[in-house]
Amino acid sequence: MYFIKLIYSEIFYRPLLNGLVFFTSMLPGRDLGLAVILLTLIIKIITFPLTHKMLHTQKKMKKIEPEIKKIYSENKDKEKQAHALMALYKAHGVSPFSGFLALLIQMPLLIALYQVFWKGIPFPQSELYAFIAAPDQVNTLFLGFIQLMQPNMWLAALAAILQFFQAKLALPSGGAGDKSDTTQRALQFQMIYFFPILVFFIAFKLPAAVSLYWTAMNFFAIIHEAAVRRQAVSDGKQ
């Protein structure tokens, strides 16, 4: 258990804390809100290879969807289905579980960010690297009226709305697929409608800085998804 806590602290919590302190110290007015947005952008850049691979996997899965349905209809035996699907994925260079890694990384990041603000300001000097100095003062008012150290309903709502649009955009163009595929349709419904509601109620209980992180992360994800879609359309016209 100690080893797991050490890994979590050194890979997620301390880098996140020190990055936030660094940006806060460097920004004019010691603006914590801008520091959270900058830190989110850095995290997005670091995780870009994983999320980019996940998006391309989704596009490939959409292309081979008719072949997947054919395998399910022609092979009623579960073992034969599994072998046929693995052969199909290998032939098209698709790893259906590659996207889960990007999603799994988000959870410890959210927990670590919550821990950073739960401990509050001033930042714990003992957790900072030797070359990072905590600022004497920190501006915790984002846009002049949102207190980032306290829950904020409006920022939580914005995070949920962007989560909705991000999930909607992530769906393959062409709808929810075959109506007979009730499992797929149920999962898509949960991702589009239920998960944003869950995001709102979770974010509403946490410091607004976490909501700001969630909002910024979804905003950058929407831009990324839109760029990938535009590239796919451009490639299709060539």
Label the predicted regions.
Residues 1-238:
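Helix-loop-helix
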